[in-house]
Amino acid sequence: MKKILYVTGSRAEYGIVRRLLTMLRETPEIQLDLAVTGMHCDNAYGNTIHIIEQDNFNIIKVVDININTTSHTHILHSMSVCLNSFGDFFSNNTYDAVMVLGDRYEIFSVAIAASMHNIPLIHIHGGEKTLANYDEFIRHSITKMSKLHLTSTEEYKKRVIQLGEKPGSVFNIGSLGAENALSLHLPNKQELELKYGSLLKRYFVVVFHPETLSTQSVNDQIDELLSAISFFKNTHDFIFIGSNADTGSDIIQRKVKYFCKEYKFRYLISIRSEDYLAMIKYSCGLIGNSSSGLIEVPSLKVATINIGDRQKGRVRGASVIDVPVEKNAIVRGINISQDEKFISVVQSSSNPYFKENALINAVRIIKDFIKSKNKDYKDFYDIPECTTSYD
């Protein structure tokens, strides 16, 4: 039996990969363990480890990295705790592969620890660009430590190969999240209202994270957004979902809570992925800078008002409206999203991240990988036409 460890650090990433984990758990020749860290272990972000426990996965390791303060220095301390904890863990626990998704700093620490113990890494969602965040260089660094790559578009597959990864180790399966939006059983509006209260006919969902490399302060970023939303306070309802634990997220959390209290809008620290998708499905659109607005929401035929540069560089479909972090621009974006012509565009648009059978293909590729001899040295793949000659 082959052993795989999946390490999860956030509610969003776990929601994307949960169906994959379920299918791997049900595969007879695989023993699947989970290690839980990051936001899952913090009350300020919903203590979402309970969701994983309810799903009955075998949690073999829990690492609380203390992320209730989000300065650059504190995040570096959290990364150090994570690196040391998983370094010790891998000294006493061997796996045929460690699987991770995305680009968060705690996952970076896990990837380093696994690599130093010569455990093959499987990386999901590599090759993507997010230019206004340190996620950008973290993601590409994880790619260089990984031996199997499951990308979400053909463009990202090419970029992973451009980083020197062998083409035979890189597979474009599409996004599991884009497939989830169409395949998961989503609650209906009445079921949502039993959990979260009455949903008005005209409401937006808002998810806003810090731009960690921006020259604009987090204070200014969130102030511009809230000023724009207040413009619609008499015509629309707004449901805010808590932000990721990035540098400055505690500032966003504090200001959003105060804003919601003042205008009687709802603030939810965290919700299950099915509820999140359903809440957006019945809404007027998603406002903010979450990657879900580009990857999952287009499958629901709902508009995304994507704010700022957090997602700059990512592939996007016609349902996405890009605006800078500036009040008047955000107001214009919200108004465009409600225009009948644009709604028609959204309804007829396709999701560039969707590819049929993403889940089935992911399981097949992972099974083939762990059965193969993957302990060989990683070689750097030189793209022939990019090799410089000095002759």
Curated annotation (Swiss-Prot):
Pfam families in alphabetical order: Epimerase_2 (PF02350)
InterPro entries according to UniProt: UDP-GlcNAc_Epase, UDP_GlcNAc_Epimerase_2_dom, WecB-like
Gene3D superfamilies linked: Glycogen Phosphorylase B
GO molecular function: hydrolase activity, hydrolyzing O-glycosyl compounds
SUPFAM superfamilies: UDP-Glycosyltransferase/glycogen phosphorylase
GO annotation, biological process: carbohydrate metabolic process; UDP-N-acetylglucosamine metabolic process
Entry function: May be involved in the synthesis of polysialic acid (PSA).
Other noteworthy facts: On the 2D-gel the determined pI of this protein is 7.38.
Name by which UniProt lists this protein: Polysialic acid biosynthesis protein P7
